[in-house]
């Protein structure tokens, strides 16, 4: 909700893909949620997704320019990095915010 407000605000959906592909999938419901304990901090429900372990990363696709503009430091959470991916080009647009930048 603080990182990506669009699903809570507009009901938008974004593709979610694993950062590292594994080939073991679970045929059960997966709910992707954010770190805030709010009922609207949900991104997507999927019926089939690969198995994930603690600290595995996923990519929320096609967030666009409004993703960071609508983000906040709600609950003293730092803002994520912005990464542009275009075919084989991967570029860090802004680095992950550090706590000492907001205190």
Model feature map: region roles:
Residues 1-103:
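Charged (often Lys/Glu-rich) extended helix/loop segments that serve as interaction or gating elements
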């Amino acid at each position: 909700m603080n990182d990506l407000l669009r699903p809570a605000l507009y009901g938008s959906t974004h593709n979610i893909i694993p950062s590292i592909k594994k080939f073991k999938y679970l045929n059960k419901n997966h709910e992707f949620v954010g770190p805030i304990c709010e009922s609207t901090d949900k991104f997507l429900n999927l019926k089939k997704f690969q198995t994930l372990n603690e600290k595995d990363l996923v990519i929320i696709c096609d967030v666009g320019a409004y993703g960071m503009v609508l983000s906040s430091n709600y609950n003293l959470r730092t803002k994520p990095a912005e990464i542009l991916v275009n075919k084989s080009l991967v570029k860090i647009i802004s680095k992950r915010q550090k706590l000492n930048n907001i205190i």
